[in-house]
A protein has these predicted regions:
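Sec-dependent N-terminal signal peptides
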Residues: 1-19
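An acidic, Gly/Ser/Thr/Pro-rich helix-cap/linker signature
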Residues: 25-127
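Surface-exposed patches in mature extracellular/periplasmic domains of secreted proteins
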Residues: 64-73, 133-139, 192-197, 223-227, ...
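Short linear loop/turn motifs
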Residues: 70-77, 225-234, 256-259, 293-299
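A short structural micro-motif
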Residues: 75-79, 143-147, 340
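Acidic/His-rich structured neighborhood in mature extracellular/periplasmic domains
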Residues: 98-240, 244
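Ligand-binding pocket segment of bilobal, Venus flytrap-like solute-binding proteins
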Residues: 221-277
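C-terminal soluble interaction/assembly domains
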Residues: 258-351
Length: 351
């Protein structure tokens, strides 16, 4: 059906609600015992299923044409591989030393430095406007997609439909994102049947979920649409806007290394928060490589090396990075890549 004459854009039957989308829904808390992943078959969805009919009702209430929505969903295909990928993301299966080795490669460091050289004026302007250092804008891009090289091979419609209707553990979140995707494709003039992204439905060089795309993407050069695949001005400004909106503090530290003295081990908190203070962590035996005062909100992070557990302490800007991806491994990789890119440019300037 996808190869038939279905390359249309969604039409509105009325005013599409929400020029500004609501904030992305936080991930649902994991149950005490995780349910087994559902077993699904590849193929089109049965649109008579009550949950699909309810979804159509919900998006139609937001102004989308019911018939057009039904036609688009009829083209969606359930993808068993998507469920498999959701069950084993790299951030959950790798130790820090393994994850860091994957992310801090010469390709990513050199690529970030090269992109900075090519777009220095643009990056400097955006950094000033949004008060976010350029190296962190580049590092998010590097970790996410190697600067736009790997933006995903799945049809986003398939990915979001599979997770919305055949992945009970996160179904409410992904049904919301599927609705946001249908609204987004209309607003940006995209064909919902051809947009590709990750197995989770993230799109473009920044891997924004549809709700984040609608809320945080910026039309920096005032073109017809917000293009997060090919337009560097939109890409840089959008990641800067995302970090800025979540409370990035310009010039403030992200991480500090720490050493544990006189205690066997410390257990990092299960959930990402800044409920601790530097003083409280120091009182538990941590020597933290920073001159920040004891009252500074802080987060203990475990960074497993090959043969020993090391510790780091995250601050407000670390927390902001985890709003992009809640894994502390991800946020540490973004920080370390940012430092590596900046160091490489500094070394080149010294020659």
């Amino acid at each position: 059906m996808r190869n038939a004459a279905l390359s249309f854009m969604l039409l509105l039957s009325g005013t599409v609600a929400a020029a500004e989308a609501p904030a992305p829904e936080p991930p649902a808390a994991a149950p005490a015992t995780a349910p087994a992943a559902p077993i699904i078959e590849h193929g089109h969805f049965d649109l008579s299923r009550p949950e699909i009919q309810s979804f159509v009702d919900q998006v139609a209430a937001q102004g989308l044409d019911r018939g057009q929505v039904t036609t688009v969903l009829a083209a969606a295909e359930a993808q068993p591989k998507i469920i498999e990928s959701m069950e084993k993301p790299a951030e959950k299966t790798l130790q820090w030393w393994e994850y860091r080795a994957r992310m801090l490669t010469p390709l990513r460091i050199d690529g970030g430095a090269q992109l900075w050289r090519e777009h220095k004026e643009l990056l400097d302007r955006i950094a000033i406007e949004y008060q976010v250092a350029p190296e962190y804008l580049l590092a998010v891009l590097g970790v996410e997609t190697q600067y736009g090289r790997t933006t995903g091979k799945y049809h986003v419609l398939d990915a979001l439909s599979t997770l919305a209707f055949d992945y009970p553990a996160r179904a409410p979140f992904f049904r919301k994102e599927l609705g946001e995707f249908l609204l987004l494709t209309h607003e940006e003039g995209l064909d919902p049947l051809t947009v590709r992204g990750s197995y989770a439905g993230a799109m473009g060089a920044l891997q924004f979920m549809p709700s984040s795309y609608r809320r945080y993407a910026v039309n920096a050069d005032h073109a017809a649409t917000r293009d997060l695949w090919n337009d560097w001005a939109d890409i840089f400004a959008s990641v800067a806007n995302y970090l800025h909106q979540y409370g990035w503090q310009y010039g403030a530290p992200v991480l500090a290394d720490a050493q544990l003295v006189g205690v066997g081990a410390l257990t990092p908190p299960e959930h990402i928060s800044l409920n601790d203070s530097l003083g409280a962590l120091r009182a538990r035996g941590l020597i933290v490589d920073t001159a920040l005062p004891d009252t500074t909100p802080a987060l203990l992070i475990g960074a497993q090396q090959q043969d020993v557990m090391s510790y780091r302490v995250g601050f407000q800007n670390f927390y902001v990075i985890t709003r992009y991806n809640t894994s502390p491994l991800y946020a540490m990789a973004v920080h370390d890549l940012a430092m590596a890119i900046k160091q490489q440019l500094g070394q080149e300037a010294a020659l």
